Amino acid sequence: MRKFIFGIILGAALLCGMKARAQYNREYFFWMGRSSMMNNDYQEAIRTLNTLLRFDEDAFEGYFLRGIAKYNLDDLLGAEADFSTAIRLNPVYTQAYTYRAITRSRLGNYDDALQDFREAIDLRPDLPGPYYSRGVTRLLNQQFKEAIDDFDKFIRQENKVADAFICRGLSYLHLKDTVRAYDNFNTAIRTNRENPGGYNRRGGLYMEQKRFAEAEADFNKAIECDSAYLLSYFNRALVYSDTNRPMLALADFDKVIQLDSTNSLTYFNRAMLRTQIGDYNRALDDYDKVALYSPNNVLVYYNRAGVYAQLGELEKAIDDYSSAIKLYPDFANAYIYRGRLRELLRDPQGAKKDRDTAQKKIAEYRSRLSDSTYSIYADTTQRFDRLLSFDSKFSGGSFDRITGHNGGHEEMRLLPLFKFTLMRPDTVPTVERYHVQRVEDFRKRVDNEYL
């Protein structure tokens, strides 16, 4: 009997010990998962949290942390699913609503994102964070007045966050209120003089207003604050290009590519700049990179065709014009230039066909101008915008990037494809053909229209 009682007591003690050990392990896995995330080791964090969730399927915080790790690895759908599970297990989990909203904003699902922000704010109207994040989402969704209202509410509680002033300044800028935009960018700089974002945004506004010296000074300051801040190098390169300093511009584009070797927009701008200074072979190398990283961009093939033509590689130029036409069949200029090259390659029928097609496309375009509703442009414009897009992001995928340091779109632009100079008629240099009399005599003897 004593042995039986002792066995029961021993079994109970072991069960208690196992329960205590399981509880200890649960906290251990949480701690290990958080530690891995603090060290930016998100894959290890996911492995650790997977182990936790296998033993405790109701650990809503585990799903929440795993969602953050997935977000930082750009697994946005997986992150959204984990945040949704956390909310299902704990319907009043404010942070889960906030971060699911941010994830949905990244996915372009603005309506559901704004609904999640409403839930978070209804649960905790005293927290400033959701107002800021909702303001960023509204800024991305082009609801600029509503975004300003959210940033106002955030700033009333947190007036030492420079990024809030930057985002509010961007909202005013989109409303064409440059005075308030400048005021907010200046406040952001005064709030945190070590934050490159304020200098970069103000410099961008200076650049748009052709105040290049002030823009350059701001971009220099932004780079001084953060020597790895890509957008400042990129924007300063645009200033150098606009002020006819191509070698300095190339050096800054080189720096951007050194820091981000897959940035197709930077390769494209560097290719155009190299073309302008006659460095055609290296321009081709850059266009090849753009075609690799943004294969559906119509301008890549169109511009590269022009470089091939300059180098006398007419067949390759025709192939690129054909690629541009395949992507955008209404591209009249591509037909025109392909037709000219076909003439040079003794293909008069192909050349005539391209000329006729180009004239037809131009006539169709002109006829559309009479459509006062512009409805006929709706699909074509959106499609052409996609054909001009580049697979480039200067911002990363972390929560800091979307809710902190960058706050909205990082605006990048192309170098101008053409530059024009207005001159008086008597100062315009006349174009003089190289004249050799023997060549002229030969042309007359042969009497062929293709010479």
Positions of the model-derived regions?
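Eukaryotic alpha-helical solenoid repeat scaffolds
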Residues: N303, A309-Q310, K326-L451
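Register position in tetratricopeptide repeats
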Residues: M38-N39, N72, R106, L140, ...
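Structural marker of alpha-solenoid helical repeat scaffolds
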Residues: F55, L89, L123, Q157-E158, ...
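Canonical positions in the second alpha-helix
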Residues: T51-L52, T85-A86, E119-A120, K153-F154, ...
